[in-house]
Amino acid sequence: MESLLTDKQRSDLETSIFGYVSRLTNDEALLSQLAAVLSQPSGSEPVPADTLKANALLLEKKWLSVIRLQRKVMDLETRLEAAEREASSTHKANGLGAGDPKTWLPKTSRFSLLHKQPVNAVSFHPFHSTLASACEDGNIRIWDYELGEIETTIKAHTRGVLDVDFSQPDTGASRDKSHDKPRADVSHAQPRALLVSCSSDLTIRIWDPQNEYANVKTLTGHDHTISAVKFTASGNHVISASRDKTVRVWSVQSGYCVRTVHGHTDWVKSCAALNEEFIFSAGIDHVTRVSEFVSGDGKMTLLGHEHVIEGVAVYPKSAAGCLAKLDKTSSYFVVSWSRDKTIRVWSSRGDPLLILRGHDNWVRGVVLHPAGRYLVSVSDDKTMRCWDLEQGGRCIRVVDAHGHFVTCVAWAPNDVNGRVRCLVATGGVDGQVKVWQ
């Protein structure tokens, strides 16, 4: 029968067996015969008895090591079972989101990761346990959020990094959001993910995580600070918003600007895209604009905010969850947030559907729960708030998130099987990146 051991492992085992037997008997004839038998499988010359006797205790030591390891494994299994029981009882005591990813909401941060200056943006890698954070010092830090450790620091820009975004390649996974699962076990054949960043140094840079975050493209063309940057869903284009009052569309492959969208009368603070069909932008002029992706022509303006609009996001009806119940005929839903302390939800026809009030200062970031029931927002009032869309947008949780203004929030994309991950990141002026898990 073919051995499962290598020649070296088999030789060590034979040596240990002979050493053990040699301690039990002094019968030289028996030991010589055993030595010859044990050496035969490898085809080598008989090992001298003196050499084998030197390893007399080796087998016993290995056996004791196995016993100790087995005890440790049993002890760890016992501790794990106790921890799982405690976690289960804690979830049930907390009520909301008791073990169900569809209703889980952030409550306690798991890690606090530190920058030396304010954090402006955070973004999760679509496959790996990796988080990127953009800092006012011009650096991007890449964190392993499972370990709470920094992986690398990218000296990205000569001035503050204002936004970062990982592309989200389509894995072909189903969109069943019934359960949460880590993304650690993924195929090497995954689509390529890239990271994009923008800065007040007037450049947009694309980085390759598969090549130690090498800078693979630098996009230039804006005439002033670049406030926001986002990949389109396909990953083929990047859209950017700038203080030069324009939104630009860039080809990832060529690095060229393929379209410039005009229409705003002041600094454009935020942008988003829907299926390379529409572009959404908002800023200091208090207006959210909807433009055609292909032509750049304006389609619609959303009016209602009474102060600077800090951000805008768009969700297709298929991913909108409870938002779809607000207007069954709307093909997508727009969410905007502002320095007027409100969050507003709009239909694809431009109708205002919800106004969420509760923050005591500028609203700086909003994200939709992947299951579609909740909105999570952060603000200069140092809090993170959770809004239940099933209850008409009622605020159901207020979390003291940071010791200073909270500037950004991100929810991890679903795992490779399309299941919700209970994982949120926030960043603040206090220089902290917090992971809520």
Swiss-Prot record:
Entry coiled-coil feature ranges: 64-94
Location relative to the cell: Cytoplasm, Cytoskeleton; Cytoplasm, Cytoskeleton, Spindle pole
Any one GO molecular-function label of the UniProt entry: microtubule plus-end binding
Any GO BP: nuclear migration
GO cellular component: cytoplasmic microtubule; kinetochore; microtubule associated complex; nuclear envelope; spindle pole
Location of the region described as Disordered in the Swiss-Prot/TrEMBL record: 165-186
Start and stop residues of the WD repeats: 114-153, 156-217, 221-260, 263-301, 304-356, 358-397, 401-437
Biased composition (Basic and acidic residues): 173-186
Superkingdom, taxonomy of origin: Eukaryota
Keyword annotations of the record: Cell cycle, Cell division, Coiled coil, Cytoplasm, Cytoskeleton, Microtubule, Mitosis, Repeat, Transport, WD repeat
PROSITE patterns: WD_REPEATS_2, WD_REPEATS_REGION
Pfam family of the protein (one): WD40
Record family assignment: Belongs to the WD repeat LIS1/nudF family.
Subunit structure: Self-associates. Interacts with NDL1 and dynein.
Annotated function: Positively regulates the activity of the minus-end directed microtubule motor protein dynein. Plays a central role in positioning the mitotic spindle at the bud neck during cell division. Targets cytoplasmic dynein to microtubule plus ends, thereby promoting dynein-mediated microtubule sliding along the bud cortex and consequently the movement of the mitotic spindle to the bud neck.
Protein known as: Nuclear distribution protein PAC1
Gene: PAC1
